[in-house]
UniProtKB/Swiss-Prot annotation:
It comes from Bos taurus (Bovine). GO terms for molecular function: actin filament binding; phosphatidylinositol phosphate binding; retromer complex binding. This is CapZ-interacting protein. The modification Phosphothreonine is found at residues 124, 222, 306. InterPro entries: FAM21/CAPZIP, RCSD. Stress-induced phosphorylation of CAPZIP may regulate the ability of F-actin-capping protein to remodel actin filament assembly.
Length: 381
Protein backbone atom coordinates (compact mmCIF):
# COMPACT_ATOMS: atom_id res chain seq x y z
CA UNK A 1 0.00 0.00 0.00
CA UNK A 2 3.00 2.31 0.51
CA UNK A 3 4.06 1.94 -3.11
CA UNK A 4 1.02 3.70 -4.52
CA UNK A 5 1.62 7.07 -2.78
CA UNK A 6 5.24 6.83 -3.87
CA UNK A 7 4.07 6.41 -7.44
CA UNK A 8 1.79 9.44 -7.17
CA UNK A 9 4.71 11.50 -5.88
CA UNK A 10 6.80 10.36 -8.82
CA UNK A 11 4.05 11.43 -11.20
CA UNK A 12 3.97 14.85 -9.60
CA UNK A 13 7.76 15.05 -9.96
CA UNK A 14 7.47 14.25 -13.66
CA UNK A 15 6.15 17.73 -14.27
CA UNK A 16 9.70 19.05 -13.81
CA UNK A 17 11.75 18.38 -16.95
CA UNK A 18 15.11 17.56 -15.26
CA UNK A 19 13.60 14.75 -13.18
CA UNK A 20 12.60 12.47 -16.15
CA UNK A 21 15.81 10.40 -16.01
CA UNK A 22 15.51 10.11 -12.28
CA UNK A 23 11.93 8.86 -12.55
CA UNK A 24 12.96 6.27 -15.11
CA UNK A 25 15.57 4.95 -12.72
CA UNK A 26 13.01 4.86 -9.93
CA UNK A 27 10.55 2.89 -12.07
CA UNK A 28 13.27 0.35 -12.88
CA UNK A 29 14.15 0.03 -9.22
CA UNK A 30 10.49 -0.45 -8.32
CA UNK A 31 10.09 -3.06 -11.06
CA UNK A 32 13.17 -4.92 -9.79
CA UNK A 33 11.87 -4.70 -6.22
CA UNK A 34 8.48 -5.96 -7.41
CA UNK A 35 10.14 -8.94 -9.11
CA UNK A 36 12.24 -9.71 -6.05
CA UNK A 37 9.36 -9.56 -3.56
CA UNK A 38 7.19 -12.23 -5.24
CA UNK A 39 10.20 -14.56 -5.48
CA UNK A 40 10.84 -14.27 -1.75
CA UNK A 41 7.16 -14.38 -0.60
CA UNK A 42 5.84 -17.64 -2.15
CA UNK A 43 7.74 -19.72 0.41
CA UNK A 44 5.90 -17.92 3.22
CA UNK A 45 2.51 -17.06 1.78
CA UNK A 46 0.84 -17.42 -1.51
CA UNK A 47 -1.94 -14.80 -1.44
CA UNK A 48 0.46 -11.83 -0.90
CA UNK A 49 1.95 -12.63 -4.32
CA UNK A 50 -1.08 -10.97 -5.88
CA UNK A 51 -0.33 -7.62 -4.24
CA UNK A 52 2.89 -6.76 -6.14
CA UNK A 53 1.12 -7.57 -9.42
CA UNK A 54 -1.13 -4.52 -9.10
CA UNK A 55 1.77 -2.02 -9.43
CA UNK A 56 2.86 -3.88 -12.54
CA UNK A 57 -0.56 -3.16 -13.98
CA UNK A 58 -0.16 0.47 -13.10
CA UNK A 59 3.28 0.56 -14.71
CA UNK A 60 2.05 -1.14 -17.81
CA UNK A 61 -1.06 1.03 -17.85
CA UNK A 62 0.98 4.02 -18.98
CA UNK A 63 2.75 2.27 -21.86
CA UNK A 64 0.15 -0.34 -22.87
CA UNK A 65 -2.66 -2.19 -21.10
CA UNK A 66 -2.41 -5.24 -23.32
CA UNK A 67 0.52 -6.60 -21.34
CA UNK A 68 -1.41 -6.37 -18.10
CA UNK A 69 -3.98 -9.05 -19.18
CA UNK A 70 -1.43 -11.87 -19.72
CA UNK A 71 0.29 -10.85 -16.50
CA UNK A 72 -3.07 -11.15 -14.68
CA UNK A 73 -3.74 -14.57 -16.26
CA UNK A 74 -0.35 -16.00 -15.25
CA UNK A 75 -0.65 -15.80 -11.45
CA UNK A 76 -3.33 -18.56 -11.08
CA UNK A 77 -1.09 -20.92 -13.08
CA UNK A 78 1.84 -20.02 -10.92
CA UNK A 79 -0.26 -20.74 -7.82
CA UNK A 80 -0.94 -24.33 -8.84
CA UNK A 81 2.64 -25.08 -9.91
CA UNK A 82 4.70 -23.31 -7.27
CA UNK A 83 2.82 -24.56 -4.16
CA UNK A 84 4.15 -27.82 -2.67
CA UNK A 85 1.29 -27.87 -0.14
CA UNK A 86 -1.27 -27.86 -2.92
CA UNK A 87 0.62 -30.65 -4.65
CA UNK A 88 0.49 -32.68 -1.45
CA UNK A 89 -3.21 -31.96 -1.08
CA UNK A 90 -3.81 -32.91 -4.66
CA UNK A 91 -1.81 -36.09 -4.18
CA UNK A 92 -3.92 -36.93 -1.12
CA UNK A 93 -7.08 -36.19 -3.07
CA UNK A 94 -5.92 -38.42 -5.88
CA UNK A 95 -5.21 -41.33 -3.52
CA UNK A 96 -8.14 -40.90 -1.12
CA UNK A 97 -10.77 -41.93 -3.67
CA UNK A 98 -8.60 -44.94 -4.49
CA UNK A 99 -8.82 -45.97 -0.83
CA UNK A 100 -12.56 -45.21 -0.76
CA UNK A 101 -13.36 -47.21 -3.89
CA UNK A 102 -13.86 -50.52 -2.01
CA UNK A 103 -16.60 -48.78 0.01
CA UNK A 104 -17.53 -51.86 2.07
CA UNK A 105 -13.97 -52.36 3.33
CA UNK A 106 -14.12 -49.73 6.14
CA UNK A 107 -17.52 -51.08 7.22
CA UNK A 108 -16.29 -54.62 7.67
CA UNK A 109 -14.05 -55.04 10.77
CA UNK A 110 -11.57 -57.28 8.97
CA UNK A 111 -10.60 -54.62 6.44
CA UNK A 112 -10.05 -51.79 8.91
CA UNK A 113 -6.57 -53.09 9.65
CA UNK A 114 -5.85 -53.05 5.94
CA UNK A 115 -7.06 -49.47 5.54
CA UNK A 116 -5.15 -48.07 8.54
CA UNK A 117 -1.61 -48.41 7.05
CA UNK A 118 -2.69 -46.37 4.04
CA UNK A 119 -3.70 -43.43 6.23
CA UNK A 120 -0.41 -43.44 8.17
CA UNK A 121 2.07 -42.72 5.30
CA UNK A 122 0.26 -39.97 3.36
CA UNK A 123 3.36 -37.76 3.78
CA UNK A 124 4.97 -39.72 0.95
CA UNK A 125 2.60 -39.23 -1.97
CA UNK A 126 4.21 -41.91 -4.15
CA UNK A 127 4.13 -44.79 -1.66
CA UNK A 128 0.36 -44.93 -0.96
CA UNK A 129 -0.40 -44.84 -4.67
CA UNK A 130 1.83 -47.83 -5.29
CA UNK A 131 0.35 -49.77 -2.37
CA UNK A 132 -3.28 -48.89 -2.91
CA UNK A 133 -3.39 -49.82 -6.58
CA UNK A 134 -2.31 -53.45 -6.13
CA UNK A 135 -4.54 -53.70 -3.07
CA UNK A 136 -7.63 -52.59 -5.01
CA UNK A 137 -7.94 -55.70 -7.18
CA UNK A 138 -7.50 -57.83 -4.06
CA UNK A 139 -10.19 -56.03 -2.00
CA UNK A 140 -12.77 -55.32 -4.69
CA UNK A 141 -13.65 -58.95 -5.50
CA UNK A 142 -13.67 -59.82 -1.80
CA UNK A 143 -15.92 -56.96 -0.73
CA UNK A 144 -18.34 -56.58 -3.64
CA UNK A 145 -18.37 -59.80 -5.62
CA UNK A 146 -17.92 -62.70 -3.20
CA UNK A 147 -19.88 -61.72 -0.07
CA UNK A 148 -23.08 -60.70 -1.86
CA UNK A 149 -22.87 -63.74 -4.10
CA UNK A 150 -22.31 -66.04 -1.17
CA UNK A 151 -24.85 -64.51 1.20
CA UNK A 152 -27.67 -62.96 -0.82
CA UNK A 153 -28.18 -65.62 -3.45
CA UNK A 154 -29.23 -68.34 -0.96
CA UNK A 155 -31.38 -65.73 0.77
CA UNK A 156 -33.15 -65.02 -2.51
CA UNK A 157 -33.71 -68.72 -2.96
CA UNK A 158 -35.29 -68.88 0.49
CA UNK A 159 -37.33 -65.68 0.33
CA UNK A 160 -38.58 -65.93 -3.24
CA UNK A 161 -42.25 -66.69 -3.67
CA UNK A 162 -41.42 -69.31 -6.28
CA UNK A 163 -40.76 -71.83 -3.54
CA UNK A 164 -44.14 -71.17 -1.96
CA UNK A 165 -45.84 -71.29 -5.36
CA UNK A 166 -44.21 -74.63 -5.99
CA UNK A 167 -45.31 -75.92 -2.59
CA UNK A 168 -48.94 -74.75 -2.38
CA UNK A 169 -50.43 -75.85 -5.72
CA UNK A 170 -49.23 -79.43 -5.31
CA UNK A 171 -51.26 -79.66 -2.10
CA UNK A 172 -54.39 -78.41 -3.85
CA UNK A 173 -53.65 -80.59 -6.84
CA UNK A 174 -53.13 -83.57 -4.56
CA UNK A 175 -56.42 -82.84 -2.82
CA UNK A 176 -58.22 -82.57 -6.15
CA UNK A 177 -56.51 -85.68 -7.45
CA UNK A 178 -57.40 -87.57 -4.28
CA UNK A 179 -61.00 -86.39 -4.49
CA UNK A 180 -61.11 -87.37 -8.17
CA UNK A 181 -59.61 -90.74 -7.37
CA UNK A 182 -62.17 -91.20 -4.58
CA UNK A 183 -65.05 -90.35 -6.91
CA UNK A 184 -63.68 -92.67 -9.57
CA UNK A 185 -63.40 -95.41 -6.95
CA UNK A 186 -67.03 -94.85 -5.96
CA UNK A 187 -68.17 -94.97 -9.60
CA UNK A 188 -66.15 -98.12 -10.15
CA UNK A 189 -67.73 -99.64 -7.04
CA UNK A 190 -71.21 -98.66 -8.25
CA UNK A 191 -70.75 -100.23 -11.67
CA UNK A 192 -69.88 -103.77 -10.47
CA UNK A 193 -72.60 -103.53 -7.83
CA UNK A 194 -75.15 -102.66 -10.49
CA UNK A 195 -73.88 -105.54 -12.58
CA UNK A 196 -74.29 -107.77 -9.55
CA UNK A 197 -77.85 -106.46 -9.17
CA UNK A 198 -78.63 -107.37 -12.78
CA UNK A 199 -77.19 -110.84 -12.21
CA UNK A 200 -79.13 -111.24 -8.97
CA UNK A 201 -82.36 -110.67 -10.84
CA UNK A 202 -81.37 -113.33 -13.36
CA UNK A 203 -80.05 -116.07 -11.06
CA UNK A 204 -79.49 -117.08 -7.44
CA UNK A 205 -75.76 -117.85 -7.74
CA UNK A 206 -74.69 -114.24 -7.31
CA UNK A 207 -76.36 -113.71 -3.91
CA UNK A 208 -73.48 -115.16 -1.81
CA UNK A 209 -71.09 -112.80 -3.59
CA UNK A 210 -73.47 -109.95 -2.86
CA UNK A 211 -73.68 -110.94 0.82
CA UNK A 212 -69.91 -110.46 1.06
CA UNK A 213 -69.96 -107.06 -0.63
CA UNK A 214 -71.86 -105.17 2.14
CA UNK A 215 -69.26 -106.35 4.67
CA UNK A 216 -66.72 -103.87 3.28
CA UNK A 217 -67.36 -100.32 4.57
CA UNK A 218 -66.80 -98.38 1.31
CA UNK A 219 -69.41 -100.45 -0.58
CA UNK A 220 -72.29 -100.07 1.88
CA UNK A 221 -73.79 -97.09 0.14
CA UNK A 222 -73.50 -98.69 -3.25
CA UNK A 223 -75.03 -101.92 -1.95
CA UNK A 224 -77.96 -99.99 -0.51
CA UNK A 225 -78.54 -98.35 -3.88
CA UNK A 226 -78.48 -101.70 -5.62
CA UNK A 227 -80.90 -103.11 -3.06
CA UNK A 228 -83.35 -100.33 -3.86
CA UNK A 229 -83.12 -101.05 -7.57
CA UNK A 230 -83.47 -104.80 -7.04
CA UNK A 231 -86.50 -104.54 -4.79
CA UNK A 232 -88.25 -102.08 -7.07
CA UNK A 233 -87.62 -104.26 -10.10
CA UNK A 234 -88.86 -107.33 -8.25
CA UNK A 235 -92.02 -105.55 -7.11
CA UNK A 236 -92.72 -104.49 -10.69
CA UNK A 237 -92.01 -108.00 -11.95
CA UNK A 238 -94.29 -109.56 -9.36
CA UNK A 239 -97.04 -107.10 -10.28
CA UNK A 240 -96.64 -107.91 -13.98
CA UNK A 241 -96.46 -111.70 -13.62
CA UNK A 242 -100.18 -112.19 -12.69
CA UNK A 243 -101.22 -110.09 -15.67
CA UNK A 244 -99.21 -112.29 -18.04
CA UNK A 245 -100.54 -115.49 -16.52
CA UNK A 246 -104.12 -114.16 -16.62
CA UNK A 247 -103.87 -113.91 -20.41
CA UNK A 248 -102.83 -117.60 -20.61
CA UNK A 249 -105.59 -119.32 -18.60
CA UNK A 250 -108.98 -118.09 -17.36
CA UNK A 251 -108.89 -120.26 -14.24
CA UNK A 252 -105.47 -118.97 -13.19
CA UNK A 253 -106.65 -115.38 -13.72
CA UNK A 254 -108.57 -115.44 -10.45
CA UNK A 255 -105.98 -117.50 -8.56
CA UNK A 256 -102.47 -116.24 -9.41
CA UNK A 257 -103.22 -112.55 -8.71
CA UNK A 258 -104.58 -113.63 -5.35
CA UNK A 259 -101.36 -115.51 -4.67
CA UNK A 260 -99.25 -112.57 -5.77
CA UNK A 261 -101.31 -110.30 -3.55
CA UNK A 262 -100.98 -112.77 -0.68
CA UNK A 263 -97.19 -112.88 -1.03
CA UNK A 264 -97.07 -109.10 -1.36
CA UNK A 265 -99.35 -108.61 1.66
CA UNK A 266 -97.12 -110.93 3.64
CA UNK A 267 -94.15 -108.84 2.55
CA UNK A 268 -95.99 -105.76 3.88
CA UNK A 269 -96.77 -107.58 7.15
CA UNK A 270 -93.12 -108.37 7.66
CA UNK A 271 -92.70 -112.15 7.91
CA UNK A 272 -88.97 -113.06 8.16
CA UNK A 273 -89.29 -115.66 5.40
CA UNK A 274 -90.53 -113.25 2.80
CA UNK A 275 -87.17 -113.35 1.04
CA UNK A 276 -87.01 -117.10 0.49
CA UNK A 277 -89.59 -117.51 -2.30
CA UNK A 278 -88.01 -114.62 -4.17
CA UNK A 279 -84.63 -116.34 -4.15
CA UNK A 280 -82.97 -114.24 -1.42
CA UNK A 281 -82.03 -117.10 0.91
CA UNK A 282 -78.32 -116.16 1.00
CA UNK A 283 -78.69 -112.52 2.09
CA UNK A 284 -77.26 -111.40 5.40
CA UNK A 285 -79.47 -111.73 8.53
CA UNK A 286 -78.67 -108.12 9.44
CA UNK A 287 -80.65 -106.83 6.47
CA UNK A 288 -83.61 -108.99 7.53
CA UNK A 289 -83.43 -107.57 11.05
CA UNK A 290 -83.36 -104.01 9.74
CA UNK A 291 -86.38 -104.70 7.58
CA UNK A 292 -88.27 -106.26 10.50
CA UNK A 293 -87.46 -103.24 12.68
CA UNK A 294 -88.56 -100.80 9.99
CA UNK A 295 -91.74 -102.81 9.42
CA UNK A 296 -92.50 -102.86 13.14
CA UNK A 297 -92.40 -99.08 13.11
CA UNK A 298 -95.24 -99.08 10.60
CA UNK A 299 -97.58 -101.90 11.70
CA UNK A 300 -100.59 -99.63 11.55
CA UNK A 301 -100.34 -98.96 7.83
CA UNK A 302 -99.96 -102.64 7.02
CA UNK A 303 -102.79 -103.57 9.42
CA UNK A 304 -105.11 -101.09 7.71
CA UNK A 305 -104.23 -102.50 4.31
CA UNK A 306 -104.89 -106.05 5.51
CA UNK A 307 -108.21 -105.03 7.06
CA UNK A 308 -109.31 -103.59 3.73
CA UNK A 309 -108.25 -106.80 2.03
CA UNK A 310 -110.21 -108.85 4.56
CA UNK A 311 -113.35 -106.77 4.05
CA UNK A 312 -113.06 -107.23 0.31
CA UNK A 313 -112.46 -110.96 0.73
CA UNK A 314 -115.56 -111.48 2.90
CA UNK A 315 -117.74 -110.14 0.12
CA UNK A 316 -116.31 -112.52 -2.47
CA UNK A 317 -115.91 -116.26 -2.38
CA UNK A 318 -112.52 -117.81 -1.57
CA UNK A 319 -110.55 -118.90 -4.67
CA UNK A 320 -110.39 -122.55 -5.71
CA UNK A 321 -107.14 -124.51 -5.28
CA UNK A 322 -104.79 -123.84 -8.24
CA UNK A 323 -104.16 -126.47 -10.90
CA UNK A 324 -100.63 -127.86 -11.22
CA UNK A 325 -100.08 -126.53 -14.76
CA UNK A 326 -101.06 -122.91 -14.06
CA UNK A 327 -98.98 -122.63 -10.84
CA UNK A 328 -95.69 -123.83 -12.30
CA UNK A 329 -93.98 -120.49 -11.69
CA UNK A 330 -95.25 -120.15 -8.11
CA UNK A 331 -94.77 -123.70 -6.82
CA UNK A 332 -92.47 -122.70 -3.88
CA UNK A 333 -95.01 -120.13 -2.76
CA UNK A 334 -97.77 -122.75 -2.53
CA UNK A 335 -95.67 -124.99 -0.32
CA UNK A 336 -94.80 -122.28 2.15
CA UNK A 337 -98.04 -120.29 2.07
CA UNK A 338 -99.43 -121.85 5.24
CA UNK A 339 -96.14 -121.47 7.14
CA UNK A 340 -95.89 -117.84 6.12
CA UNK A 341 -99.41 -117.17 7.31
CA UNK A 342 -98.73 -118.75 10.71
CA UNK A 343 -95.45 -116.87 11.19
CA UNK A 344 -96.98 -113.58 10.03
CA UNK A 345 -99.81 -114.00 12.55
CA UNK A 346 -97.37 -114.78 15.37
CA UNK A 347 -95.10 -111.81 14.63
CA UNK A 348 -97.84 -109.20 14.17
CA UNK A 349 -101.45 -109.47 15.31
CA UNK A 350 -102.43 -106.85 12.71
CA UNK A 351 -101.69 -109.29 9.88
CA UNK A 352 -104.22 -112.11 9.70
CA UNK A 353 -103.54 -115.42 7.91
CA UNK A 354 -106.70 -115.00 5.88
CA UNK A 355 -105.36 -111.84 4.24
CA UNK A 356 -103.29 -113.77 1.73
CA UNK A 357 -105.87 -116.48 0.92
CA UNK A 358 -108.95 -114.23 0.65
CA UNK A 359 -107.30 -111.24 -1.00
CA UNK A 360 -108.98 -109.62 -3.97
CA UNK A 361 -107.26 -109.80 -7.34
CA UNK A 362 -108.10 -106.10 -7.89
CA UNK A 363 -106.20 -104.94 -4.80
CA UNK A 364 -102.94 -106.46 -6.00
CA UNK A 365 -102.01 -103.09 -7.47
CA UNK A 366 -102.43 -101.37 -4.11
CA UNK A 367 -100.22 -103.71 -2.10
CA UNK A 368 -97.06 -103.33 -4.22
CA UNK A 369 -97.13 -99.65 -3.34
CA UNK A 370 -96.68 -100.47 0.34
CA UNK A 371 -94.01 -102.93 -0.67
CA UNK A 372 -92.26 -100.24 -2.67
CA UNK A 373 -92.36 -97.87 0.28
CA UNK A 374 -90.90 -100.31 2.79
CA UNK A 375 -87.56 -101.05 1.08
CA UNK A 376 -86.81 -97.34 0.71
CA UNK A 377 -87.25 -96.95 4.44
CA UNK A 378 -85.16 -100.07 5.04
CA UNK A 379 -82.21 -98.61 3.19
CA UNK A 380 -82.52 -95.38 5.14
CA UNK A 381 -82.35 -97.32 8.41
Amino acid sequence: MEERPAQTNAIVDDSAPPSVAQLAGRFREQAAAAKETPASKPTRRKPPCSLPLFPSKVELGQNGEEKSLPSANHPPKVKVKSSPLIEKLQANLVFDPAALLPGASPKSPGFKAMVSPFHSPPSTPSSPGVRSRPSEPEEVPVSFDQPPEGSHLPCYNKVRTRGSIKRRPPSRRFRRSQSDCGELGEFRAVEPSQENGAKEESGDEVFPAKSKAPGSPPLRRTSSRTEKLEEKSRAVGEAQEPEKIAGGSEEGAGQHPARASSSEAEDGCGSPKEERPAGEQAEEPTEVKERVASEEEEPRQSSQDTEELEEGAVEEEPPQPPPGGGAGGHSPEQGTSEEKQDEGASLKPGCSPNSGAHAQPDTSSEVPRTEDNTPVQDTKM
